[in-house]
Amino acid sequence: SRLGKSIIKIEELAKQLKGKLAGPVGAYNGLSMIVKDPEDLERRYLAFLGLEASEYSNQLVEPEYLLRLLLECNTAFGIIANLADDLRNLQRSEIGEVFEYFSSTQVGSSTMPQKRNPWNSEHVKSLWKAMCPRVITFYMDQISEHQRDLTNSASQRFIADYVAGFTMAVSRMKKVVSGLQADTEAMAKTLENAGGRVRGGVLAEPAYILLGEAGVSDGHEIVRKITLECEKTGEPFFTVLKLKKLGVADAETFFENPARYRGLAAEKSKRIAEKYAALMKG
């Protein structure tokens, strides 16, 4: 959802980029001497480049068009880096819920041959770290002293460098996501341990909600005490809850499988993915 909104915004801002053929001070002085309608000539010339004329210009096109586009690119870059970081952490040895494609000839670590490094996700994060600070320069290039100066003659050359880095990160992230594999057993283990020291503690929240629905006024306190008992005895949350015989509706079927406590996660994720996939196709 975050990335989809940003992509749409990038497309909108890219279409708003403007150009100029209005002479060194934007007043069409020279063109007025050789053509009757210099603004028409400007429109036709820029049309070949897929651009419209800037509403106003001096020696430069208004810098905000490009600035806004670059800022939105950096927003998307941050979203991609955030995703890369999440996937990188999920591939840590002690979590291991997902992992990138790993070929039979690939080396994960120079000292630990058994290790798989999430190097693609790490590379995306590294690209973002290198490119993100350049936003400060984009802002600085918004200022053109006394209509025109050459203090951006070097700095703006690195815009292409930034766009190349952003494009590389997008390509690498696409590769990561398309080849991502899941370890469902590790995911189930994470779910089981989600309650910390309380086995099956992830069900504590729905338990006190159901108790409240059943008319139990101190459901939260009851569940809190059950979790303390679970910590002492090592018994799973559902086992102790069942022994209390609190009469929670549907407890037998609901609490036997913690995976049922997922709300609309799957349905909403699929709906959002389908929405933006359709928008990208136009």
Where do the PLM segments sit?
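Internal glycine-rich alpha/beta core junctions
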Residues: 1-141
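Glycine-rich cofactor/substrate-binding loops
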Residues: 110-282
